[in-house]
Design a protein with these regions (language model features):
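Catalytic and ligand-binding motifs that coordinate phosphates/metal ions
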Residues: 268-278
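Beta-rich carbohydrate-recognition and catalytic domains
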Residues: 4-216, 221-222, 228-268, 281, ...
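Secretory/extracellular carbohydrate-interaction modules
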Residues: 354-366
């Protein structure tokens, strides 16, 4: 890869205020503030050199009168942790000042040689890009390289919309999916070397069974994150209409054939933009963006409201959760094991049977 560093224009690391407001959430991973940023989608997540790293979209709110030049888009904030519970902010190095374009959604991956990299959509470029970590703290990155697939005749495809890319390796081949607009299907590319990409067509298999899955094939698939879980493939994604959801199925003949579809949102679509990683002991752990909602209508706070004047957060990262499959292939979701260290003053009752239409009072629990 191009070893030119892009981290030399970094701004200082964000920091929590010494005395945060009473309504400021500090239990979840929340961007420091208040009133300084609009944090959003979680993005590249890694376990690397003994630490977990997570990036997320971070758009600093600058009053219009203080803006200098055009708005080139958001940065990616960067945090790391030894346990995915207690986080440290790093300097913000991935953004317009260093990459030449804003950082929209993407994902992290490891090359076949074990080197960490990122693939993402560069705001304003209508293209996806790849960059590689140059140091163990992930504070220095290579100059971004263009991802431009070719058709069967070897001609570059320049008129295709690209956004929200995800990348994985299967049988020694790199595959990358590009999300597209709500009226278009996600498309697949493949490469042997991360430089030369072939366009493969639609990701979803033509045998996609809408009746069985309970969802239309053309339902928006954005923020995809695809990985193997047990002997099945899982596609986490969102619909801008439905919120966070998932498919379970098989990746066969270089297409994805789902067998199950499930929702991760119910009353509201405030659980958004999933991202996951593998832990050091092989667990699949995911995050999502918890968008701000109004209690009355369960809808995101309208952007036209005076967000700059709000003294509350406009989004936090969900608590991390572990994903696994049951023996009969059902997706199981449970809180991250490491969160147990936050528990105090445990009360326990065991071998308890509660019959229907009865009340059992737990002693010492309020």
């Amino acid at each position: 890869c191009n070893a030119q560093q892009v981290g030399n224009a970094a701004i200082k690391a964000p920091a929590m205020p010494e005395n945060p407001p009473e309504n400021w959430l500090t239990y979840h991973l929340a961007h420091p503030g208040p009133g300084t940023a609009t944090p959003g989608d979680p993005n590249p997540a890694f376990f690397w050199k003994g630490r977990y790293h997570l990036h997320y979209i971070y758009k600093e709110r600058v009053p219009r009168r203080k803006r200098k030049g055009p708005d080139l888009g958001p940065d990616w904030a960067h945090v790391s942790s030894e346990d995915m519970v207690h986080w440290t902010w790093h300097p913000t190095v991935l953004g317009p000042k260093t990459m030449g374009h804003g950082m929209f959604s993407g994902t992290g991956f490891f090359t076949k040689e074990g080197k960490p990299g990122i693939i993402y959509h560069g705001k304003g470029s209508n293209r996806n890009w790849i960059s590689y970590a140059l140091d163990d703290s992930m504070d220095q990155w290579s100059k971004p390289e263009l991802v431009l697939p070719k058709d069967q005749e070897g001609k570059p495809i320049t008129d295709m919309p690209y956004f929200d890319p995800d990348l994985w390796i299967d049988n020694g081949i790199y595959y990358a999916v590009n999300a597209r607009s709500s009226s278009q299907a996600p498309v697949l590319m493949k490469s042997d070397n991360l430089k030369d990409w072939d366009y493969m067509g639609e990701l979803l298999h033509p045998d996609f069974d809408e009746a069985k899955l309970g969802v239309a094939k053309d339902e928006d698939i954005s923020c995809p994150n695809m990985f193997k879980l047990g002997d099945k493939w899982v596609l986490l994604c969102i619909s801008h209409r439905l919120g966070c959801r998932y498919f379970i199925g098989d990746f066969q003949d270089e297409q994805f054939l789902p067998e199950q579809h499930g929702m991760m949102n119910w009353a509201a679509w405030d659980f958004f933009a999933p991202e996951s990683l593998l832990t050091s002991d092989g667990r699949r752990v995911m995050w999502s963006w918890c968008t701000t909602i109004t209690p009355k209508r369960f809808q995101p706070v309208p952007r036209k409201k005076k967000l700059g004047a709000l003294k509350i957060q406009t989004g936090v990262q969900s608590l991390p959760r572990e994903l696994s499959l049951s023996e009969d292939g059902v997706l199981l979701i449970k809180p991250l094991r490491e969160l147990e260290q936050l528990r105090t003053d445990e009360k326990r009752e065991e071998n308890l049977t509660v019959k229907g239409d009865t009340t059992h009072v737990l002693q010492g629990v309020t």
